[in-house]
Amino acid sequence: MLFMAKILILGANGKIAKLAEKELLEKTTHQLTLFLRNADRLKSSDDKREMVVEGDTTDTKSLEKALKGIDIVYANLAGKNIEQQAKSVVTAMNTVGVKRLIWISTLGIYDEVPGNFGKWNHQMLDGGYLETYAAAAKVIENSDLDYTLVRPAWLSNKDIVSYETTEKGEPFKGTEVSRKSIADFVVHLINEPDKESRHSVGVNQPNTDGDKPSFY
């Protein structure tokens, strides 16, 4: 690695976050702060490079404390209060002066998924999920942070890294993508901090077009 950064991972117990953590430890020299609601659920894999911090992402003060000295924030968050979490993250980052944010969202927040798959996606995700993730994304996009929104297709646990991307305003491609692929994309964004700055990026596995993911 040509540089070493201090990374704060929010929602560090998530599946994608754990995969990204593993890749960051194996392939980079970055220092990691793992932030999650219950610290007992996660053990540090490398005490020299990792610190586990317990906190709630809606608690701006605990976020501000965790953000001290951080270069890049990677947020792997979920829940019905995702919009409130987004507001808290933006506020804390602005207060401390941290600019770079990688935020995992979901496909469909702009109604960008075409055809029968788009209809199926609405049927599966409308009624609270898409709406809250769209609202959270709007909070991030309306901030002056140096953000990248990542919009994964339906997630699989396949042991492959294979993905392509689409930009906001383009029709979403494919139906699915592996968590391992999203983790790999996140690590690339961390290693190239200027990449996809203030962009919202759809991520899918190539050649997975269809009416729904293969595992449905």
Region locations from a protein language model:
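NAD(P)H-binding glycine-rich loop region in Rossmannoid oxidoreductase-like domains
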Residues: 2, 7-8, 34, 39-95
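Nucleotide donor/acceptor-binding cores
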Residues: 5, 30, 99
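N-terminal Rossmann NAD(P)H-binding glycine-rich loop of SDR-like oxidoreductase domains
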Residues: 5-27
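Active-site-lining helix/loop region of Rossmann-like oxidoreductase modules
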Residues: 10-15, 130, 139, 157-159, ...
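Residues in the short beta-alpha loop(s) of Rossmann-like NAD(P)-binding domains
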Residues: 13, 38, 107
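A generic structural motif
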Residues: 28-32, 196
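Short beta-strand "acidic-cap" motif of Rossmann-like dinucleotide-binding folds
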Residues: 32-34, 150
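Glycine-/Pro-rich loop/turn segments that contact NAD(P) or position catalytic residues
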Residues: 81-166
